[in-house]
């Protein structure tokens, strides 16, 4: 069986200060992370930031779910997500956490580049320190009885809203 080297993980300080970055707060399901990667590639996301622990390995199920996106969207593995968010804030990123209890609908939040959209694990959502480190916490308003989505579906909806509002569609 042939073995391959893992894809390199860039440093958070080398991320382009433009476009959109996704930040994943302890999303452990490889199907969800793979689907998020695939959507991220479709929306030209610059990178996905996630913790080295409490995230699935970039192999097997995740790679299959990502449909080739692992080679297109850099994964930035960090030890401490709150510190990574602080670094993004210091580098000029607008960090927007997504939570059903957010104060404003994402479509009403004044967005700018560079933008970091922060998604929490299903069930638990964003951890408290993650929420506190985000510049703002927004929600995705929906007209139906169910007010929350699977995290991979929430990611694609947030990416669409963000990319549309920032004028990144069709670039």
Task: Annotate each language-model stretch with its function.
Residues 1-171:
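Post-transcriptional modification and biogenesis factors for structured RNAs
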């Amino acid at each position: 069986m042939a073995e391959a080297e893992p894809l390199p993980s860039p440093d958070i300080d080398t991320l382009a200060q433009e476009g959109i970055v996704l930040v994943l707060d302890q999303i452990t399901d490889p199907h969800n992370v793979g689907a998020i990667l695939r959507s991220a590639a479709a929306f030209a996301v610059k990178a996905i930031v996630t913790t080295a622990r409490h995230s699935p390995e970039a192999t097997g199920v995740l790679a299959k779910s990502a449909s080739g996106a692992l080679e297109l969207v850099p994964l930035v593995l960090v030890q401490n997500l709150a510190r990574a968010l602080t670094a993004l804030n210091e580098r000029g990123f607008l960090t927007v956490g997504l939570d059903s209890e957010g104060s404003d609908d994402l479509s009403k939040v004044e967005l700018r580049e560079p933008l970091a959209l922060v998604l929490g694990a299903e069930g638990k959502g964003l951890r408290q320190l993650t929420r506190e480190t985000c510049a703002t916490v927004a929600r995705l308003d929906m007209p139906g009885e169910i007010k929350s989505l699977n995290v991979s579906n929430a990611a694609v909806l947030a990416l669409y809203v963000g990319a549309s509002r920032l004028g990144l569609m069709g670039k």
